[in-house]
């Protein structure tokens, strides 16, 4: 028999295609490379809009790294990342908790100069070294520089 059409086609509401087409599941955004002992976090295009989003990030990173039983270095891609302003403090607090528990050194990158500045300032306020770069190669090199 033929496949049924998506019922959203007939509804008088947005279809939610943005979510279906653009959202990458959090678990697919996280990858540990055992050979290099580096954890890669791909937040490209990620939108943090609720406290639940922050909790989901914390839980996913902890689930990926806790089994290692030690801290690792990390590289985080923040290209096209967005966060609602009222959640920045909670987000940075979550980042600090993850760093304390799971990371030696973290480098971050985004081509967005405003985001580098904004998140960088918030991280530095909490005595978290920002290590924010404009490109992936600079961030990778930042791991190798003491």
Regions found by a protein language model. Name each.
Residues 1-146:
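Amphipathic, Lys/Arg-enriched alpha-helical "gate/interface" segment within cytosolic domains
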